[in-house]
């Protein structure tokens, strides 16, 4: 893992960023950082969460299941699902995008699941690394790129991996 690939302002997780994720209903929130903790307490968001990690395995626990997130995979967490995050090491890098719910969202977005990441998604994830915080609809081309990122997920994520155990 190369920490130089993380924007300077977002090198370590600021636990208060989670209160900002839902500050603006129509924004897409972007956050890349080293976790630097052994545990992120149970919480939830009003937005859907795309979670990709590097540098170690991450366990995500919900009220129903415990998910095992390996390298080169992402976890889709629909809005409103309570979850806690347990990295295998505090040096794990979290790459998050939080998307507002849309009336025309495909059924894919309502189901929590783990999916493999291909080279296209890796490149898009790394492209968003330069962004930190809210991205508003008036911020073009950022908002369109982030929206395209979300819209392509169902097409690229045809095979959910059953890497979860009942809790």
Regions found by a protein language model. Give the residues of each.
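Generic protein-terminus/edge-of-domain signal
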Residues: 1-57
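A generic beta-sheet turn/junction motif
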Residues: 46, 62-64, 89
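Short hydrophobic beta-strand segments that form the core of ligand-binding sensory/regulatory domains
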Residues: 49, 74, 84, 94-100, ...
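Short acidic-glycine-tyrosine-enriched beta hairpin
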Residues: 64-79
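Ligand-binding loop in jelly-roll beta-barrel domains
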Residues: 81-112
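An amphipathic alpha-helical interaction segment
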Residues: 114-167
């Amino acid at each position: 893992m190369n920490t130089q690939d993380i924007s300077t302002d977002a090198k370590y997780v600021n636990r208060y960023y989670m209160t900002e994720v839902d500050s603006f209903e129509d924004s897409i929130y972007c956050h890349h950082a080293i976790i630097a903790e052994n545990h992120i307490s149970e919480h939830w968001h009003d937005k859907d969460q795309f979670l990709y990690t590097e540098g170690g395995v991450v366990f995500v626990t919900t009220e129903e299941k415990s998910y095992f997130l390996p390298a080169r995979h992402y976890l889709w967490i629909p809005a409103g699902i309570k979850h806690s995050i347990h990295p295998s090491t505090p040096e794990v890098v979290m790459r998050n995008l939080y998307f507002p719910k849309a009336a025309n969202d495909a059924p894919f977005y309502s189901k929590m699941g783990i999916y493999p990441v291909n080279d296209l998604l890796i490149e898009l994830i790394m492209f968003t690394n330069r962004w930190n915080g809210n991205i508003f609809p008036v911020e073009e081309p950022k908002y369109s790129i982030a929206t395209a990122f979300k819209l392509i997920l169902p097409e690229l994520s045809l095979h959910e991996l059953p890497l979860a155990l009942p809790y």
